[in-house]
């Protein structure tokens, strides 16, 4: 009877906010290489609790019959490359055996915006929702709960293996009959970043009948009750802060608040479309607001706010979700831009990508410059553009110590030759993207009245011409960006998809990155068939 009552409350909460949230299907994009996070999340939420399967895909989830290791509290969404996060794993279990792994198979599973549930074949039933910094669980038909502070996604023991996450240290402590605290410190992952620490505070509404902690890695707690509500506060600063991040609201109240919050955002765009089209549209809109994540007040290295992390990567988002956020929620984009400036103030460069409180990895250009220029062009208020302009100039002029982490690689060659020669990784991509970055710097310089700098960077924005090869033909089309040596000679053969000079599958794609001056040749161009295909 209790379960029926809880289901009724859940569906009431869902129906109240169903006007737009009902169209969001978290499963879209989650299978294969999509790697979209399927669990509950607040907009730009720091905590993203969800299942982690044994195969350890980037966002944790894999379809049945893949076994589930447990539910961790931190995830990214829709990312490629190596894994990141998957910290602080909890797993309900039946029986009394104390093991360090409890992989279990699902017999049923439900997911919707802000809500996830599954039944294990072994018996336990799990429901999950979340606040910005606290995961909320409702367990039924369990005997105990296993807490693992030392595991995570993409774990690897090979020292300094590229893109692998590696264990640094952990601690776990049982505080009385209702609370467990601890932390997990991990380094590496997709951006090859330095160590980051995730602190947690777990609180149960049922007392522990029995509790054991071991090796500063694991804890097991047993219950007399078969229904247990658990909250897991998360912090990147301290266990005390994790405890403060635990919300007072219960499962259903928090779910209702989450749905109301999302509905307000999704309702900013209304479309006249079929149900299937609406489902695709609002799910895509929802996905644009999962990252970056708001960690204001949760930075262990400095206190300036706002602070956002998990820019994954600005190379991808400057032309997609970032301009959209500027239009839909300008106050949010203002905070994101100011966060980029705060990162520059404290670490020396704005990121092109960032995760786990570390910049990296750069993709094609210094693309935070484009985000600043977009905000400036749209008149976004509350930003010190003169100060932001200094960060843009540093990107353009000062070579970083580690060009994979931040800044512009090959900047000396770019500024002296007017292009980056092959032999330097991503030479073609970087030349094209630095040209557009410089065009963006020029626009901000003009708007701020820096006329000499405007002329300088406008001229440099034409550097892509130095890699334009008008006689190169590919699949019946002619005229493309192509790699060139420091001696001025062209690289005649490029194995597309395998070249370090241009990291794309065809010469078309870097050519299309010329947002400020694309050459498509007019009506009589050999590019006409391609133009017709992409329209």
Regions found by a protein language model. Give the residues of each.
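Bacterial Sec-dependent N-terminal signal peptides
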Residues: 1-19
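Accessory carbohydrate-recognition regions in carbohydrate-active enzymes
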Residues: 19-370, 376-432, 440-466, 472-478, ...
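ATP-dependent phospho-/nucleotidyl transfer catalytic cores
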Residues: 437
